[in-house]
Structure formats: C-alpha cells, structure tokens
Amino acid sequence: MPRTKEEPELSEFEKQRAANIAERDALLKKLTLEAQSAGIFSKPPASKSSSQTKKKPAPKRVKKEDEPPVPRRMSSRLRGLAAESEIAKRKAEDEYQAMKAAAQAKRMRISGDLNVGDIVVGENKWNETGLQGLGIVNSAQRYQRTFGEEDIKKTTNKELKELREKMSGLQLWEPWEPNRIKITRERIYSMLFHPTESKPLIFAGDKTGHLGILDASQQPDQNESDEEDEYPDPTITTIKPHTNTISAMHIHPSDPSKLYSGSYDSSIRALDLEKSVATEAYAPASSSDDEPLSGIDMAPTDPHVLYFTTLDGFFGRHDMRVSSKANPGDGSAVTFYQLSEKKIGGFSLCPTQPHYMATASLDRTMKVWDLRHLSTKHPKPVGEHESSLSVSHAAFNQKGQIATTSYDNSIKIYDLASKGLKDWKPNHTLSEDEMAPDAVIRHNCQTGKWVTILRPQWQACPDSPVERFCIGNMNRFVDIYTSTGEQLAQLGADVITAVPAVAVFHRTQNWVVGGTGSAKVCLWM
C-alpha cells in the first residue's frame, strides 16, 4: 500500500491567525450586504455561463494579389519642394495684393483734362446742344406732417400767410414720378440748380463719383395709342468725372458755363458745359496724397479763387491762375490752414462780405473766421458756438445770417447782421453770449448710415425780402423755413418712397429739388 502523508498539527499561533481571517471575512460579507440593501453599492453583474459564451468564427483569409512596391515616402524638404501650406499662403497673399492694387487703382484720382464723351456712363450720350447759351446767364415717421394747411390758416401776419401759401403751393413735377427719375448710379450726396431761369437744369453728384444731369423742361415722348405707363423714362446724362464721392458743387455767377465739383478723391474739376471738357481745377501735388474734400465755395466778386475744406480739418485757398502742383518755393497757389483737429463737415462764405466764413465741425463747434487776418500757424476765429453734438453744416445767406444743422436734432440760426457784421473792423471778436443762436428749430437730424447728412441751403436771391432755406425731412418731406425760424412749407407726396435728404433751392426761382439715397429726384415748381 502506498504510504499516506500525515497532515502536520497546527500550532496555537496559526490557529489564532485562521480564526482572525474567518472573523474578518464574515465582517466584510456582512458590511457588503448592508451596503447593497442601502443602495450604496450596485449588485455585481451576474457572470455569464459558459453555455452562453460563443466563440466567434475566425474571418476567412483572402489571398492578396502581389502588388508592385510602393515608392518610399519622402518629405517635401528632402525633395527640394516648398511646403503646400507655404505655396497656398503665398498664392493667397499675391491674390490679395493684386485685388487691393486693382481697387486702389480704380479709386485713384485721374489727372488732366477729361473729355465728357469719354466718361459718359450708360446709354444716354452727352448732348451739349441743350446746354449752349448757358454762359450768358447772369427718427422718422413716414409721411407724418408737422406743418400743413391748418398752420397756414392760423397765420395772422398777412405777408407771412401769403408767402406760406405761395411756397406750399409748389407742385411736384408731373411728367414722371420720382421713382422713375434715377439721376445717378448710387446715393446722392450733392445737388445744384443751374442759375438759368429758362428751364430747370439739375446736377447731382453721388457716392462713387458719378455726375447726373437732368433737363426738367423735357416732356414724355408718348403717342396717343400708347398706354399711360408705357412711355420711356426721362432722358438723363450721367458722366464720371471723379473716382470717389462728389461732396459739393458750385457755379460762379460770372461764368455759368462752368460747373465746379469737389470730391473725396481730393480734386476739384471744372466741367465746361459748352466745350464738354472737365478740367482739373485743383489737385494735391502728388497723386498719392489723400485729402478728401468736404466742401467748396467761391467769392461772388472773384471767379479765380477756390476755397475748400477737407475731412482732416483743413481749409484751403487756391488761385486757379497758378498751378496747384507748383513747388512752394516757386510761389504755390495753394494755402492751407488747419482750423480744426477733426473733420470739417461744411462751410460757406458770406455772399455780401466774402472775407467772412463759417465752418461746421465734428468737434461740435460752429466758428466764424475773418479771412483777412487768418494765420497759417495759429488761426483764431472771430467767434464760436459749441453744440452738444457734432455740427454738420454752416450756411451763410446774403444778409449775414448763418443756418446750421447738428446731431443734437436742431437747426440753429445766427443773425450776425443784427450784430453789425458789415461794419466790423479787422480783428473784431464776438463773445460767447454774442455767438448764441437767435433761433433754434427742433428738427430730426438722425440720418443713420444710409441717408445723406441733412444740410440747410439758402435761396441766394429770393423774390421777397424774406430770407428762406430748405432742408430734408426724415419723414420724407422737404421743409422750408425763414431766417427767423418760421416754417413756410412742407413739400411732399405719397409717391416719394425715400427721404429727399439733399435739398436745394434754385438761385432766383421758387424751384426746389430733393435727392434720395436711391438716387431718385423729387422736383417741385
């Protein structure tokens, strides 16, 4: 028989150790059961039985065909090539620079004379026959009126009532509705009547340098058999003398055949309406100089000198008999004065005292200057008045009164004639109290991004002693006021679909035209 191995007898220490282990296991089991009943531990998942475990079949092996060896990968650096990202980056940069240069070239000022026939835009060609002889001429609530027939009826002053009835009686030009009279390509920034009294001849400058010309004496070419809405739109000539916004226009009374236009492209051009040539009247010495012009004016007594302001706060004086591109040492014809640290939005000379000038600035001031004693180093104004917000424009009339518009929603009128303007001695100054406005008209001037800034414009030679000016109304009207702040008329019509923000008077006739952001024209006569 095989010999069996006897189990050795445990010592007292080992017996005690085994008892301790058993006691510990029992305690752990008890604690685990109590924790599970209290929800602290989840029950261990049940182990799958061996019968439920199935072995997945091994995938079938597919015999691979012999393939040609793949070339070994090499980096672009080892192959002597630039990384693709660098090539793409360089290509994108080159394309960007090319586009930037093309855009800059498109907006760059064109020097020299321009033949009008070469800058005509669109199908309507330039026709100078209708312009011959001009050189011999001496928050807005839509359609909600703030002035109307009831106001006229309540007028007690006989002369004022007659004038209100006369101005309110102006009628919208009938042959075409405003939405069919698109005079330029983009938003209108400036407008002007030709001084001729024989017919309403209207000029409009837009945001991109187009100049539109409308002869409002034309009539629709309509046959009797045609339906009323089938006759063609009015004939409008559009040319492009500038490469940027036409901000201001002027015709000197001694030479009505020339139209001067100032632009954000830093130049002033003189368009000869009879010779059909647009000559460069002023431009900076270098074509790379960027000096956007905000306004132009001329003294009635001097047809040779141009005055202009810039968006950089400068005021310039240019004698057209000398080239503006001459070197300073050769007797340059241009003199600059920095009148403001910020943009000058508009300015005007006093027609009867042209050595006095008014400027309106983004620095919230309207200032009056004496050009006879204007220093290039430290120019000092005759007087100034500060508004709570920026002042957009300052317009002088023939009597020495100034009308301004401001973003504080007001039109302010300053009567310098009553303060002895024509008798002022050189170096005369006005105190703060003397520069206070004589009349303040509440007027919505919050034009926003898509409406041209509202500017008052006086009638140069009215047919009565009452001075008057017109200004666009955000409710889609054109308002007419006197120099004392009394409203004469509110011109409008249901067919006007945009704000006629740019509004101007004819020099002598009671004709008013308004231009909109959609380049449409509203004409009252």
Swiss-Prot record:
GO biological-process terms attached to the record: DNA damage response; regulation of DNA damage checkpoint
Cellular compartments per GO CC: nucleus
SUPFAM superfamilies in UniProt: WD40 repeat-like (SSF50978)
Region annotated Disordered, chain positions: 38-86, 212-233
Keyword DNA damage assigned: yes
Biased composition (Acidic residues): 223-232
Matches recorded under InterPro entries: WD40/YVTN_repeat-like_dom_sf (IPR015943), WD40_repeat_CS (IPR019775), WD40_repeat_dom_sf (IPR036322), WD40_rpt (IPR001680), WD_repeat_DNA-damage-binding (IPR050853)
Keyword Repeat annotated: yes
Keywords, sorted A to Z: DNA damage, DNA-binding, Repeat, WD repeat
Annotated WD repeat ranges: 183-224, 241-281, 288-328, 339-379, 384-425, 448-491, 494-525
Annotated GO MF terms: DNA binding
Superkingdom of the organism of origin: Eukaryota
Alphabetical list of Pfam families matching this protein: WD40 (PF00400)
Biased composition (Basic residues): 53-62
Function: DNA-binding protein that binds to both single- and double-stranded DNA. Binds preferentially to UV-damaged DNA. May be involved in DNA-metabolic processes.
Family that this chain belongs to: Belongs to the WD repeat DDB2/WDR76 family.
Protein name (record): DNA damage-binding protein CMR1
Organism the protein comes from: Coccidioides immitis (strain RS)
Taxon lineage: Eukaryota, Fungi, Dikarya, Ascomycota, Pezizomycotina
